[in-house]
């Protein structure tokens, strides 16, 4: 028995937050006795067309290593991957019966494609929803209407929907989607990755942010401004930013901000690092920080980086946006503050540094959540049971 994780909204085995969530799903399914096949449907030029990691079989049906200079050939490659995927899915189902497909896509055409395949092969289809469906359709009423229509149609082209937040459950329920089709799966984390304490990769104390360097979504600019406030009181602490910016514009803005605040020798941009390197950076940080601003993205989602932060037992300073306050309480298992305010965020960072022994005790309380609510094995079993009800 197996589960296929399919989509064009992630890379694998290396990638971003979606990739990490898929790794946790897959590990949980495998430990519960279910085989996992990951099909990356994106048009990505990759040296590996297929492989296996930690018992997870993965495939890239696009299958091209280099980009052709001819448009007709590129179009042909994009077209033929649909037949390759169909053939691949049939082979998997024949040798390792598929109980369900878990789809990860924001494209209505891609969702329609996998829906038709699932119906043809008679496999249940469960969609993943980790972000606000209308986040890219803000502005005019016509844009919002287009987003609403696409969201509604996409939600009809599946048997079930896994929602990362209660907000998304209510969003779809308010639009006529039956509640029995909706299932809450909060952020998940593989705690085993963070249990082994390794030597610090850096030779100094540091506050750390790990993730895509975004301004509107994760407020990296706010974090930099907050660090500027505390940097004079703590001259031996650096700010380390792991990841790359989502746009060239954001990359330029963030690096210019660091320069303008005279922090070039205090803020470290590591760039993208491998998934295996992340735990050593997180577990050796002084503080793990996330200054996420209030936004439509924050309202509906829950940052996967936060559950990774929690699993380390390192003090966390985070803004109280979206459903973060549902799970975390200021001074109980993390340190929360209001969003969009560098001064207040800096005050909370300073408080943790000034009361570090107590902060470690609070961090250990937060760590307990990763053994229960956010535990990958527990949530994978819940997903399996939900699929059986469809």
Feature map (PLM): residue ranges:
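Nucleotide-sugar donor phosphate/pyrophosphate-binding loop at the beta->alpha transition
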Residues: 109, 121-124, 132-157, 191
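Acidic donor-binding loop of glycosyltransferase active sites
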Residues: 266, 282-300, 314
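Carbohydrate-associated surface elements
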Residues: 167, 188
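Short hydrophobic beta-strand element within catalytic cores of glycosyltransferases
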Residues: 287-290, 308-311, 315-318, 335
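A short, well-ordered alpha-helix in the C-terminal region of glycosyltransferases
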Residues: 344, 351, 358-373, 382-385
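Nucleotide-activated donor-binding/catalytic signature segment of Leloir-type glycosyltransferases, i.e.
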Residues: 242-243, 251-279
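Conserved acidic donor-binding segment of nucleotide-sugar-dependent glycosyltransferases
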Residues: 330-331, 335-342, 351-357
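Conserved donor-binding/catalytic core segment of Leloir-type glycosyltransferases
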Residues: 4, 162, 200-218, 224-227, ...
């Amino acid at each position: 028995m197996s589960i296929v994780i399919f989509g064009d909204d992630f890379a694998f085995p290396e990638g971003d937050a979606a990739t990490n969530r898929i790794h946790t799903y897959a590990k949980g399914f495998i430990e519960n006795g279910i085989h996992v096949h990951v099909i990356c449907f994106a048009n990505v030029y990759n040296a590996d067309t297929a492989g296996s990691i930690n018992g997870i079989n993965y495939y890239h049906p696009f299958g091209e290593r280099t980009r052709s200079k001819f448009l007709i050939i590129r179009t042909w490659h994009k077209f033929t991957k649909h037949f390759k995927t169909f053939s691949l899915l049939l082979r998997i189902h024949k040798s390792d019966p598929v109980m369900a497909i878990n789809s990860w896509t924001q494209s209505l055409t891609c969702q329609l494609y996998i829906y038709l395949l699932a119906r043809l092969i008679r496999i249940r289809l469960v969609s993943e929803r980790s972000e606000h469906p209308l986040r890219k359709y803000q502005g005019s009423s016509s844009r919002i209407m287009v987003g609403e229509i696409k969201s509604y149609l996409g939600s009809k082209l599946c048997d079930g929907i896994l929602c990362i937040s209660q907000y998304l459950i209510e969003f779809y329920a308010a639009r006529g989607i039956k509640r029995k089709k909706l299932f809450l799966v909060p952020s998940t984390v593989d705690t085993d990755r963070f249990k082994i304490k390794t030597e610090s990769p850096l030779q100094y104390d540091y506050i750390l942010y790990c993730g895509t360097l975004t301004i509107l979504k994760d407020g990296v600019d706010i974090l930099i401004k907050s660090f500027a406030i505390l940097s004079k009181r703590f001259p031996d602490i650096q700010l380390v930013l792991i990841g790359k910016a989502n746009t060239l514009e954001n990359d330029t803005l963030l690096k210019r901000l660091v320069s303008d605040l005279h922090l070039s020798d205090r803020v470290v941009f590591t760039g993208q690092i491998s998934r295996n390197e992340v735990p050593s950076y997180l577990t050796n940080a002084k503080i793990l920080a996330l200054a996420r601003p209030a936004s439509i993205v924050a309202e509906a989602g829950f940052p996967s980086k936060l559950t990774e932060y929690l699993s380390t037992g390192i003090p966390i300073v985070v803004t109280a946006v979206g459903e973060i306050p549902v799970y975390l309480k200021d001074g109980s298992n993390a340190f929360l503050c209001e969003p969009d305010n560098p001064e207040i965020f800096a005050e909370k960072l300073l408080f943790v540094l000034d009361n570090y022994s107590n902060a470690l005790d609070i961090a250990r309380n937060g760590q307990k959540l990763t053994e229960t609510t956010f535990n990958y094995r527990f949530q994978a079993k819940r997903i399996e049971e939900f699929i059986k009800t469809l």
